[in-house]
Amino acid sequence: MQRITITLDEELLDVIDRRVASQGYQGRSEAIRDLLRAGMRESEALPDDAACVAVVSYLYDHSTRELPRRLNQTLHAHHDLTRSTLHVHLDAGHCLEVSVLQGESGRIGELSRQLMVERGVEHGQVQVMPAPGQAKVR
């Protein structure tokens, strides 16, 4: 095994520490490895060229410089995948967006990653399903 260093904000570290305690892990490393494995399984669920539908949701701080514009540009650059988007103002500083996407799994994964790695996006999640008539996710 190799040792790496990562930087986490205190809130995220608290979440990991609570998971360590509630799930009975010996330490943070195994909990983080399990989370990484789950993320990798999720991203490998469908072949890149498989037709699918997806829901991508993300919560962000709309005061982050240029973030709303960047998110909007990213969605417009992939307008052929976007079926619908819901925008919710949660409080004075945070918004939630939920987009329904349809297209090839690889392109949807790429779009989802582009949205969620933006600075100021605090939480994000993608749920991918085979399009009607397609094989089930393995």
From Swiss-Prot:
Record's function text: Transcriptional regulator.
PANTHER family linked to this entry: NICKEL-RESPONSIVE REGULATOR
A molecular function (GO) term: DNA binding
InterPro entries, A to Z: Acetolactate_synth/TF_NikR_C, ACT-like_dom_sf, Arc_rbn_hlx_hlx, CopG, CopG/NikR_regulator, Ni_resp_reg_NikR, Nickel_NikR_proteobac, Ribbon_hlx_hlx
Protein name, per record: Putative nickel-responsive regulator
Pfam families: NikR_C (PF08753), RHH_1 (PF01402)
Species of origin: Pseudomonas putida (strain W619)
Cofactor requirements of the protein: Ni(2+)
Chain sites annotated for binding Ni(2+): 76, 87, 89, 95
